[in-house]
UniProtKB/Swiss-Prot annotation:
GO terms for biological process: translation. Its main location: plastid. This is Small ribosomal subunit protein uS15c. Belongs to the universal ribosomal protein uS15 family. Keywords: Organellar chromatophore, Plastid, Ribonucleoprotein, Ribosomal protein.
Length: 89
């Protein structure tokens, strides 16, 4: 489920590290988290949508890899992002 342009822009503005940042690890994790939450709501309504469930698991794996990379860059950046997004680390 793609995100609309206004939602993407809000996420970028909140999580960017400088004025032209659109692809940093923080922004990517924030966008994946938003997509995961939307898809989780969809799957609660449609329990037998197995292709969407597989896509959800792929997104969760990608977010986990990005979070591991962010942790290797610095524990403080990792913990700030986890707290800001409200996800488990």
């Amino acid at each position: 489920m793609p995100l609309d342009t206004t939602t993407k822009q809000k996420l970028i503005n909140v999580h960017q590290t400088h004025s032209t940042d659109t692809g940093s690890v923080e922004v990517q994790v924030a966008m994946l988290t938003e997509r995961i939450s939307k898809l989780s709501g969809h799957l609660q309504q449609n329990k037998h949508d197995f292709s969407s469930r597989q896509g959800l698991l792929k997104m969760i794996g990608r977010r986990k890899r990005l979070l591991n990379y962010l942790r290797s860059l610095g524990e403080d950046r990792y913990s700030q992002l986890i707290n800001k997004l409200g996800i488990r680390g």
